[in-house]
Amino acid sequence: MSFPIDSIKIKVESHFLAQQSSLLEGKYVFSYTVTIVNLSDINVTLKSRHWIITDANGAESQVKGPGVVGETPTIAPNNAYQYTSGTVFETPVGFMHGRYTMESGLGETFEASIPSFRLAMPGVMQ
């Protein structure tokens, strides 16, 4: 029996951090809060992350590593895990997407897609 991947829901909200940004230096700081919901009937553990980060100029970087914010959380059935992290762009707009490598309580490894989301300084249209 394979794990029902569609039972993992991922939602992301981003915020521009004006006080930490420096527009003259081309430093645009953002936070983002990720909520991962486990709608299955077994535990899942987030093992690693892979982010693809693209600024408004098309410059792309990738971030890979174990867990998130120093944790490899186990999410119980019908529960959620939430964390906040951040990134810095050289442009006032950027996009992020990626995937989490997860492991079910049955030992099955699978990938959960992180949908693309926009990070933008308020008032910027791009």
From Swiss-Prot:
**GO terms (BP aspect):** error-free translesion synthesis
Start and end residues of each ApaG domain: 2-126
Its domain of life? Bacteria
The record ties this protein, via PROSITE patterns, to: APAG (PS51087)
The family database entries (InterPro entries) matched by this protein are listed as: ApaG_domain, ApaG_sf, Uncharacterised_ApaG
**HAMAP family named among the record's database cross-references:** ApaG
What is the protein's name according to its record?
A: Protein ApaG
> From which organism does this entry originate?
Shewanella denitrificans (strain OS217 / ATCC BAA-1090 / DSM 15013)
Identify the taxonomic lineage of the organism of origin: Bacteria, Pseudomonadati, Pseudomonadota, Gammaproteobacteria, Alteromonadales
